[in-house]
UniProtKB/Swiss-Prot annotation:
Native source species: Methanococcus maripaludis (strain C7 / ATCC BAA-1331)
Enzyme class: transferase
GO molecular function annotation: ATP binding; UMP kinase activity
Signal peptide stretch: none
Protein encoded by which gene: pyrH
Protein name per UniProt: Uridylate kinase
Protein purpose: Catalyzes the reversible phosphorylation of UMP to UDP.
Catalytic reaction(s) noted: UMP + ATP = UDP + ADP
Cell location: Cytoplasm
Length: 225
């Protein structure tokens, strides 16, 4: 199976900072999927690293430049994961999809970050999945699925086990994004998922759920075309 993972920067690099054990656990999960015969791509978010830098930079500059800072943070996080993957990855963070595909064709795990200003890594992962004609897109975040509202600030939010892409658009369509923003699925990614008719799963970004997402035994939300 050809699978693209959108790995939230905040799950790889939590507020407490970098953890050797945490990064190693994610690397082992992706290595195991590769050993099982799957072709694995991982797009890593900027997370707290990006937000900390952007919050300071925003006092001095515009959103476009803040986007560039965020992209660099995603690539730093990508390099950490690449270092933990060892020989299963290439020590290079591609900046476009053609270079990314070359790495996949080398039978390596692809790890990359952001590509364009104003595009979140969710949108990058969805576009990559469309570009390589992936079988599955998995969005691994700090929330365990898609809810009717943001469960982090709405107690009446209801988790949805299965929705279609049109319903996803309705849920995410009213959200606005700025540099460093995070959401379960951002509006642009939702549009790409709908356009490309991508089978998508949203899970809590822990190694166990990453492995379970392939078999279908996950506890997240399945999004169908």
């Amino acid at each position: 199976m050809d699978v693209v993972f959108a790995l939230g920067g905040s799950v790889l690099m939590p507020k407490e900072g970098a953890s050797t054990e945490n990064i190693q656990n994610y690397a082992q999960a992706f290595k195991k999927l590769k050993e099982m015969g799957h072709r694995v791509s991982v797009v890593v978010g900027g997370g707290n690293t990006a937000r900390q830098y952007i919050s300071v930079a925003r006092e001095f500059t515009n959103e476009s430049f803040c986007d560039e800072i965020g992209i660099l943070a995603t690539r730093m996080n990508s390099m950490l994961l690449i270092s933990a993957l060892g020989k299963d990855a290439v020590k290079q963070v591609p900046e476009n999809f053609k270079d990314a595909e070359l790495i996949l064709n080398m039978d390596k795990i692809l790890v990359m970050g952001g590509t364009h200003p104003a595009h979140t890594t969710d949108a990058v992962s969805a576009t990559l999945a469309e570009f390589i004609d992936a079988d599955l897109l998995v969005i691994a975040t700090n929330v365990d699925g898609v809810y009717t509202k943001d469960p982090r600030c709405n107690e009446d939010a209801v988790k949805l086990d299965k929705i279609n892409t049109k319903e996803l658009l309705e849920i995410t369509g009213s959200n606005s994004m700025s540099a460093g923003s995070s959401g379960v699925v951002d509006p642009l990614a939702s549009k790409i998922i709908d356009r490309a008719k991508l089978k998508t799963i949203v899970i809590k970004g822990i190694p166990e759920e990453i492995l379970a997402s392939i078999s279908g035994n996950h506890n997240g939300t399945t999004i169908t075309p």
